[in-house]
Amino acid sequence: MSSLSGKVQTVLGPVEPSQLGRTLTHEHLTMAFDSFYCPPPPCQEAASREPIMMKNLFWIQKNPYSHQENLQLNQEVEAVREELLYFKAKGGGAVVENTTTGLSRDVRTLKWLAEQTGVHIIAGAGFYVDATHSAATRAMSVEQLTDVLISEILHGADGTSIKCGVIGEIGCSWPLTDSERKVLQATAHAQAQLGCPVIIHPGRNPGAPFQIIRVLQEAGADISKTVMSHLDRSIFDKKELLEFAQLGCYLEYDLFGTELLNYQLSPDIDMPDDNKRIRRVRFLVNEGYEDRILMAHDIHTKHRLMKYGGHGYSHILTNVVPKMLLRGLTERVLDKILRENPKQWLTFK
């Protein structure tokens, strides 16, 4: 294992796990999502090019991936800085920033945000989904991909000495592509060498999380140090969810604040609202999985920032936690989900 054993690696360097506090395990602070632009509905093309204004926020909220400017979160560094200060004032301590290669990762800005706010920021190593893989990435062997992941954690990312502290979010489609499968295998190999945390973005199909865990297991990954993201939009059947939970990974509900009638990235999926997410978390707690649950918002577009009338990075702490208490979850359980579980996951073995 690496010299990071027993530590959490932030963009400002290793810290003691006890320093993290309440942690959001799946967010984006600076990124570009323009690779996933969705054409607007018929006769609404002009709306996709207008500046973000009060009068068109309703349209953007309903069509977030059809507005060009909305996909450029990396234009809002100052707004994100202000939001992180607000998050800290509300009791937040750390954010895992899941932007990887393919989403315009910017570790320099992450370091600046950490310095400016005092919030611990953990950067993500690796590659997003196949649609963002370069020809060079697709041409790499598993061994070469493994070397890239290890280097981003031990030496620095994006030509800097700023080091990542997790592998991921590793992007996967449904079904997996050959390039994504290689990246998963490399992720397992790097994790085996480093003892580091891993976080996965599954394809939008109930079978995707199962397929990914199988690939990781076969390649030697430590599933107990691995997070499966986006379960709110992936596995809906309770029996199937319990079957997946038995595999031993962390179960992440990370779309809090997202309440959509039509989910543009997968129209067949009925996106749950926060009340349903709370009930699903309570279900998992009652089934004995409180040690495996994580929560976040996965903010990746402008309209979800408070600057544009969105819920922001403090939504879970200010709004969701009180509702969870009202629904019978205890302070002890919520402390485990927001503090202890992230700490255990992020600590290098």
Curated annotation (Swiss-Prot):
Q: In which tissues is it expressed?
A: Expressed primarily in proximal tubules of the kidney.
The record's keywords, sorted A to Z, are: Cytoplasm, Hydrolase, Metal-binding
The UniProt GO MF terms for this protein read: N-acetyltaurine hydrolase activity; zinc ion binding
* Localization per Swiss-Prot or TrEMBL: Cytoplasm, Cytosol
GO BP of this protein: catabolic process; epithelial cell differentiation; regulation of appetite; taurine metabolic process
Q: Mainly localized where?
A: cytoplasm
InterPro entries in the record: AryldialkylPase_Zn-BS (IPR017947), Metal_Hydrolase (IPR032466), Phosphotriesterase (IPR001559)
Its function? N-acetyltaurine hydrolase that regulates feeding by catalyzing the hydrolysis of N-acetyltaurine into taurine and acetate. N-acetyltaurine has anorexigenic and anti-obesity effects that are dependent on GFRAL receptor and GDF15. PTER also acts on other N-acetyl amino acids (Met, Ile, Leu, Val) and N-propionyltaurine, but at lower rates. Binds resiniferotoxin, a vanilloid that desensitizes nociceptive neurons.
| A Pfam family hit | PTE
**The keyword Metal-binding belongs to this UniProt entry's keyword annotation:** yes
Domain of life of the organism encoding this protein: Eukaryota
**Chemical reaction(s) catalysed:** N-acetyltaurine + H2O = taurine + acetate; N-propanoyltaurine + H2O = propanoate + taurine; N-acetyl-L-methionine + H2O = L-methionine + acetate; N-acetyl-L-isoleucine + H2O = L-isoleucine + acetate
EC number, as in UniProt: 3.1.-.-
List required co-factors.
Answer: a divalent metal cation
Q: How is the cofactor bound?
A: Binds 2 divalent metal cations per subunit.
Question: CDD domains this protein is in?
Answer: PTE
Q: Where does a divalent metal cation 2 bind?
A: E169, H201, H230
Q: What is the lineage of its organism?
A: Eukaryota, Metazoa, Chordata, Craniata, Vertebrata
Protein name, per record: N-acetyltaurine hydrolase
Q: What class of enzyme is it?
A: hydrolase
Record-annotated residues binding a divalent metal cation 1? H26, H28, E169, D298
Q: Which family does it belong to?
A: Belongs to the metallo-dependent hydrolases superfamily. Phosphotriesterase family.
One cellular-component annotation, GO: cytosol
